[in-house]
Amino acid sequence: MCTASCDGVALKTQARVVVIGGGISGCSLLYHLTKLGWTDVVLVEKDELTSGSTWLAAGNVVQWTSNRCNARLHQYSIKLYQELEAETGQATGWRTTGSLRLATTTDRMDEYRHVLSKDHTLGIECNLVSPEEAQKLFPFMHTEGLVGAMHHVLDGHCDPAGTTSALARGARQAGAEVYRFNRVRGLSRARSGEWVVHTEKGDITCEIVVNAGGLWADRVAAMVDVYLPMMPIEHHHVLFEDLSEIETLEGELTSLRDPDVPFYLRKEGNSLLVGPYESDCKAWSANGVAWDWAQMDLPVDLERIQQYILRLMDRVPMLKDAGLKHIRNGPIAYTPDGQQLLGPVYGVPNFYCLAGCNFGITQAGGVGKYLAEWIVEGEPSIDLSSLDPRRFGNWTSKSYTWATALEAYRLQYQLAIPDTERVAGRPVKTPPIYDLQEAQGAVFGSRYGWERANWFAPDGVEPVDRLSFRR
């Protein structure tokens, strides 16, 4: 059955799945549900597709991660984006460039060796290179202070809006429907146990609801009395004026990352685009993003990012004489551990979460595929436990989320040494003998909000973790 018109088509009153949110992740899920044979599915978006974080994204798609689950997501996304334009007829702007991740310390190279071994077991094409080999891949950089680099061969970038549109088009071609400019105002349960999604244009009754609300996912979750631990964090990226060296360059230019500054850098047209990750980061709209916010930049804070731009210029000297074409600042949703929230929501039947992703373009292909498997087949084909939203219980407060989300952004490029314990927002829950253990030199870790003693420092030994990839 259908009711009022929405986005040029009649709004269905009944569907099997309603996806809330038209960013790249929501559109990817819709696309992959149809690939598994579920075509009675709809997506509801309050504004235009890609009007949230997707609209502001740089479009980088990389396979680097220390997390095996995320590596599978990234790997699949690249495969999908390479093929999507030919399948749907919608341009995605995909470019295979490869990427370099620089190392200026031996600890960083140890990290790369650790990740390299994991990547090779997954069939990811990557290798370690010397400073001289790295310079051949990115000829505009100085190699002073470099120990080496890691090279991922198939990394690249895409047009976020074009890729999202391609996913939406592919889903529509298979029978799904997309309703833009139609905000969800509430959720309720029918006597049958089905969900009723109350939208501005009418109600849709469905079996399953997926919250892919992006920056608004916490507000959607609140409609079913669920607190979703995520916080928008400001992120700048800067485009330089056109550069003659780039204009005359033949072929693609390998993208560049220096995690010890940190920044990412890639070719954009005849120029270079850089995104720094500042330690003095700032949360935005901590009490919830306004429903009418869409496709808008946040105020630029040049003072906050200038030190990173100056360090970039030391690495790529030709940028010292380059002007700035534009600076953009936009919000990215971060969770307490920097990992997204993917899967069923505890205590709310047939309600799934697809939110809190700070690498949305990189991971969207994979999360759409594997969440679709979870919904249709009852379980995903890979282990997604590290992303399961049920890892955060009712102990996760707003103040904890604030502190830990900011920490997650600051430590985005932190050395991924196993057993590293983060400290923000702690302690949350302590056992009765916590004070006694602390007095005895306990060094604590945290699991599911609980403080637990990992080890005890002997007399004369400072009770501090000193972690390394080496013994």
Per-segment meaning from a language model:
Residues 11-25, 42:
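Beta1/beta-strand and adjacent pyrophosphate-binding region of the FAD-binding site
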Residues 34-54:
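Glycine-rich FAD pyrophosphate-binding loop
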Residues 199, 203-252, 382:
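Central helical "cap/lid" subdomain
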Residues 59-137, 260-265, 269-271, 406-424, ...:
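Dinucleotide-binding Rossmann-like beta1-alpha1 core, especially the glycine-rich loop
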Residues 150-208:
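Helical element adjacent to the flavin cofactor pocket in flavoenzyme catalytic cores
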